[in-house]
Amino acid sequence: MANKTEQTVIDLISPIIEAHNDLLWDLTFTKEGGQKVLRILLDKPDHQFITMNDLTLFTQEVNELLDTVDPDPIPEAYVLDISSPGADRPLKELWHFEWAKEANENILVSLFVAKEGQKKWQGKIADLNKDGLTLTTTNGRLPLTFDEIAKAILDVQF
């Protein structure tokens, strides 16, 4: 769930995202190593890949917008980091898991508490609903609620 600053930035940049037919995968505003970082992860819909040219164009437009909008949504100094989500993209929202299931991708899940003696599980999403998922692993099917999942990422096999 986005905080107030994140939501304000999302609202401001949404028209740019739509104009470029991009997909906002994630947006965070955090403190890292003593500095504030606004991180925007972009992709293309329908399992297409975003290009460096796409990211460069988007960065220029967002920089200009955030530098000129009044009131300034982020009045303090910060680093703007715009990139693709990458092969090991984070899975945070229900639609992220739907995307991974639709693409038949492997995911890596870290649990808060071990289940069947393990805190980390790798597999494909067999079933998915608003409360959780069933992961097909080498040990069989493992039902998990989203409350049990500490972190999930795409686990692309090369």
Swiss-Prot record:
GO BP annotations listed: ribosomal small subunit assembly; translation
Regions annotated as coiled coil: none
Q: Name one GO cellular component term.
A: cytosol
Q: Which UniProt keywords apply?
A: Cytoplasm, Ribosome biogenesis
The reply to whether Isomerase figures as a keyword in the UniProt entry is no
Q: Which domain of life is it from?
A: Bacteria
Q: Where in the cell is it found?
A: Cytoplasm
In which broad location class does this protein mainly occur, judging by the first location in its UniProt entry? cytoplasm
The text of the family note is: Belongs to the RimP family.
Q: What does this protein do?
A: Required for maturation of 30S ribosomal subunits.
- Which protein are we looking at? Ribosome maturation factor RimP
Give the organism the record lists: Leuconostoc mesenteroides subsp. mesenteroides (strain ATCC 8293 / DSM 20343 / BCRC 11652 / CCM 1803 / JCM 6124 / NCDO 523 / NBRC 100496 / NCIMB 8023 / NCTC 12954 / NRRL B-1118 / 37Y)
Per the UniProt record, the lineage of the source organism begins with: Bacteria, Bacillati, Bacillota, Bacilli, Lactobacillales
